[in-house]
């Protein structure tokens, strides 16, 4: 007896519904992978759970390429079906909005994956692709970091060389000034010694003039005669002052 057809309806029990979703999702992703491998077809699968969690599969390395291809194909078909320009404009805006929204959601999901979040629904191939992308990004980051470090090191080396050259120039100038000062000091000392070694000139004395200068001429020794006369007068005055009482006494005695 054949098995009867099971009616499809929403599972009311939350736990059973979650278990069924996990099983069917795994099987669906497996079937999508099988058809892409067996038939060499480009397959993309997007699934949102009742809580809004995203699950996807893409035979390409990037889901964005598949979505952009789908948008271009759908846009071309809608252009042929809807001739009205107003309807076309609304359709274009709606399609652009949907495209941008899907792209934003995809970027946000990729960002969470790069941070190591929501990795459970990803397959082995998706994890390998994510690992490869992270390794490539790390290589670029390390390369840029090494480049900046080398540039900084070269700048510091050039700065050090400039400082050393400036220091050498200042040292050379200081030595030149010291040599100039030392030379001037040596010249001054030599000049002082040469001045001290020169004999002092003696006054010239002619013998005849020397004899004339020592003669006791009243005309040539006026100051001396004046001094002698003055001294004689002083002695006379002293004698007069001293002997006057004696003379008076003798005079009285004689009388």
Swiss-Prot record:
Additional observations: Mutations in the CAL gene result in a characteristic proliferation of inflorescence meristems in place of floral meristems. The fragment expressed in cal-5 mutant is homolog to the CAL proteins present in Brassica oleracea var. botrytis and may thus explain the 'cauliflower'-shaped floral meristem.
Impact reported for residue 120 to G: In strain: cv. Bretagny
Expression across tissues: Expressed in young flower primordia.
InterPro entries attached to this UniProt entry: MADS-box/MEF2_TF, MEF2-like_N, TF_Kbox, TF_MADSbox, TF_MADSbox_sf
Record's subunit section: Homodimer capable of binding to CArG-box sequences.
Mutagenesis or variant effect for residue 195 to I: In strain: cv. Co-1
Any one GO BP annotation for this protein: positive regulation of flower development
Impact noted for substituting residue 184 to R: In strain: cv. NL2
Superkingdom of source: Eukaryota
Full protein name: Transcription factor CAULIFLOWER
Gene3D superfamilies: Transcription factor, MADS-box
The MADS-box domain, residue ranges: 1-61
Domain K-box: 90-180
Coiled-coil residues: 90-198
Effect of residue 186 to I: In strain: cv. Wassilewskija
């Amino acid at each position: 007896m054949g098995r009867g057809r099971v009616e499809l309806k929403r599972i009311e029990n939350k736990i059973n519904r979650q278990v069924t979703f996990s099983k069917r999702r795994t099987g669906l992703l497996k079937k999508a992978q099988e058809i892409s491998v067996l038939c060499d077809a480009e397959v993309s699968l997007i699934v949102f759970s009742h809580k809004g969690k995203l699950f996807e599969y893409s035979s390409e390395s990037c889901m964005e390429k598949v979505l952009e291809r789908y948008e271009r194909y759908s846009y071309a078909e809608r252009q042929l079906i809807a001739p009205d320009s107003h309807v076309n404009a609304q359709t274009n805006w709606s399609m652009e909005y949907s495209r941008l929204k899907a792209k934003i959601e995809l970027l946000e999901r990729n960002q969470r994956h790069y941070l190591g979040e929501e990795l459970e629904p990803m397959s082995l191939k998706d994890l390998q692709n994510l690992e490869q992308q992270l390794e490539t990004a790390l290589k670029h980051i390390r390369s840029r970091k090494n480049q900046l470090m080398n540039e900084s090191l070269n700048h510091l080396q050039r700065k050090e060389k400039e400082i050393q050259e400036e220091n050498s120039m200042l040292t050379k100038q200081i030595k030149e000034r010291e040599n100039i000062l030392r030379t001037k000091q040596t010249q001054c000392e030599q000049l002082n010694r040469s001045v001290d070694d020169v004999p002092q000139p003696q006054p010239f004395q002619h013998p005849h003039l020397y004899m004339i200068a020592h003669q006791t001429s009243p005309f040539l020794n006026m100051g001396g005669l004046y001094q002698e006369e003055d001294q004689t007068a002083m002695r006379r005055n002293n004698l007069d002052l001293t002997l006057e009482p004696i003379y008076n006494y003798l005079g009285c005695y004689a009388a």
